[in-house]
């Protein structure tokens, strides 16, 4: 068998001798039947076959990424933030409404959560941090153009 014939067999381009026999048998059966059945067979064959072969490409609903904004006032709210991280959501945490000691505890707690989830934690402003799980890639940086002393003098 030549390569050309093998390729035809592989792609199904070569006619099978058995298929011509079936077609001849079908044609003989249709010739013997009354003309009303012949027209019904023709009508069935005239239907568009693409309707049966439709496949929806968007069958799976895409999971959208979410970013949660959190502004905890007490340390106990840090557990809610960690739950969001465990559910693969990025969290922006504003610590301005907490005392310095409590905000330090929240940062320590969240750094442990982020480490356990193999995520990352980045400061994005004065008393504001971004915690991301491992499925979120963070690119770029925010430079601190204003020193913290200037922020405190302006009341920020």
Swiss-Prot record:
Subcellular location(s) of the protein: Cytoplasm
Primary subcellular site in the record, as a coarse category: cytoplasm
Task: Give any single GO term for biological process.
Answer: division septum assembly
* Region Disordered, residue ranges: 30-49
Protein keywords: Cell cycle, Cell division, Cytoplasm, Septation
GO CC terms, sorted = cytoplasm
Instruction: Give the domain of life.
Output: Bacteria
Give the UniProt family note.
Answer: Belongs to the SepF family.
Q: How does it assemble?
A: Homodimer. Interacts with FtsZ.
**Entry's PANTHER family?**
CELL DIVISION PROTEIN SEPF
Function according to Swiss-Prot or TrEMBL:
Cell division protein that is part of the divisome complex and is recruited early to the Z-ring. Probably stimulates Z-ring formation, perhaps through the cross-linking of FtsZ protofilaments. Its function overlaps with FtsA.
Name it: Cell division protein SepF
Organism per entry: Exiguobacterium sp. (strain ATCC BAA-1283 / AT1b)
């Amino acid at each position: 068998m030549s390569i050309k014939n093998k390729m035809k067999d592989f792609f199904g381009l070569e006619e099978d001798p058995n298929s011509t026999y079936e077609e001849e048998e079908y044609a003989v059966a249709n010739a013997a039947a009354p003309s009303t059945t012949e027209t019904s067979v023709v009508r069935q064959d005239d239907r568009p076959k693409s309707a049966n072969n439709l496949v929806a490409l968007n069958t799976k609903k895409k999971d959208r990424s979410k970013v949660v904004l959190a502004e905890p006032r007490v340390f106990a709210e840090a557990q809610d933030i960690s739950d969001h991280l465990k559910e693969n959501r990025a969290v922006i945490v504003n610590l301005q409404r907490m005392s310095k000691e409590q905000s330090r505890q929240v940062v320590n707690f969240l750094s442990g959560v982020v480490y356990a989830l193999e995520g990352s934690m980045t400061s994005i402003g004065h008393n504001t941090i971004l915690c991301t799980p491992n499925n979120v890639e963070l690119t770029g940086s925010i430079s601190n153009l204003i020193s913290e002393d200037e922020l405190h003098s302006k009341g920020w």
